[in-house]
Amino acid sequence: MPVAAAVVLLAAGCASLGSVKPEDAVKQRAENYWKARAAGQVDKAYELTSPSYRKVRTFDQFKMQFGNAAGIRGASVVKVDCEPEKCTVRTKVETTPALMGVSVGTIATHLDEIWLLEDGQWWRYQDI
């Protein structure tokens, strides 16, 4: 009898892992992406791009494109809309542009980004 109870509890635990809503999972990963970018942790941001992107773009190429040209001060996910294998995330990003000799302060903008389900995980889509 104790073995049967353990099997039931194990099955219930595994089932609960799959019950995370795509919107919640994507929101968390998008927040992690922007936290990494704001902290200058380009390697962590790169790890959240899709495996198919990483097959054709190296970390150094990603870093050249998305290094610290504009200082990201903060970001917050505003909205997540999901289809079965694609989510659109609207994120408010606050940046301090690096303009030589000009101080423009912090600028806030909203970005729409795509997250794709690939190999059972959500990844940030990045144009090549």
Where are these regions (language model features)?
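Alpha-helix termination/capping residues and helix-transition junctions
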Residues: 8-11, 39, 69
